[in-house]
Amino acid sequence: MGAASRGARYLRWAIVAAGLAAMVWGVRQTGMRPPGPENGPRPSSPPAAFGPTVPAPSQPAATPPVGMVWVPGGEFSMGCADPRGIPFGGNDPMPDARPIHRVRVAGFWMDATEVTNDQFAAFVAATGYVTVAERPPRPEDFPGAPAENLVAGSIVFTPPAEPVPLRDPTGMAHLRWWAYVPGACWRRPTGPDSDLQGLGDAPVVHVAFEDAAAYARWAGKRLPTEAEWEFAARGGLSGAVYPWGDAFRPGGRWMANIWQGRFPGENTAVDGFVGAAPVGRFPPNGYGLHDMAGNVWEWCADWYRPDTYLGDAGPDGRAVAVDPRGPADSFDPQEPGQPKRVQRGGSFLCSDQYCSRYIVGTRGKGEVASSTNHIGFRCVQTP
């Protein structure tokens, strides 16, 4: 474990000891604090317009792997225009999703749904794997922390009983709806008194980045790059706002599992789900992929930097990035010492009131050792 990661984890556990774990976790995560003017790069010129998505003339060479669909690859415009002002676009300008730039990816197989509890349980049964949330922290990794406070657990959404001002100028509103719960993990998603009964087809949650990567290796797969994920999420559409098109609710139908009601205390669940939905309950996109918006965040392989797209676009903004794998390291100016990977798709907690990252071109980020009850993943496979 590197010094930066070790220090970050010690700080998290030290604050757990003080009963304020959500403070550390919350500011590490996308959508958990109000946007600010320094949240990302400032392109020197207006973002390019979306160009057409041009699928590659590729066909899968074999029978589809179980539970996977073919994503043909091709060239597309990656990124997101400032969503403020569009219906349900939210209040965040999303500067790290610009400039919009051209990207080309090769074809690949992708899980049609997020990895489920049943699938993850099969992995654990076969390997004996223990997730980050289930591991008691080692004293040598957290010098000075009282032994009684080195307790395994994870972060759980806990709606407050009273309204919360989402635009709190202190940036600490999120402390009101996240709680560190000892014993919470993928097997016990809301704490030690919970279990997975009836949740076998729900997406596995409370998985840190290394947990997702370990499952992918066992399954003979890998985590998608950010470019692969966005190409797949767009489903062949060119510059659409959502994986299914530009209308938020076409024909009045809910197309994704996101928050309804006043966030974070009132969840009207008019889409039928209070938390994560069983996978595949909402319509697929053009490539046959379900839940590419909402439900649970999905880990990608790339390190996170807010200026990644500036490099991919080239000096004149006209470059075509071919199968980009992301930057060599992580840097988030909000938290320079925290190593973060990209997360995509948003979750059941996303709302235009606070986190509109169900918009297909927007980006998320997560500290690599963090796990919560709204973070999961899906895998890809190179043919």
What are these regions (language model features)?
Residues 1, 16, 329-333:
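Compositionally biased, intrinsically disordered low-complexity regions used as flexible
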Residues 370-372:
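Short coil/turn motifs at beta-sheet boundaries
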Residues 66, 100, 105, 199, ...:
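Short coil/loop residues immediately preceding or within conserved phosphate-binding loops
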Residues 2-193, 210, 342-343, 367, ...:
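Short, compositionally biased
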Residues 41, 70-71, 77, 81-83, ...:
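Functional-site microenvironments in short loops/helix caps that host divalent-cation chemistry
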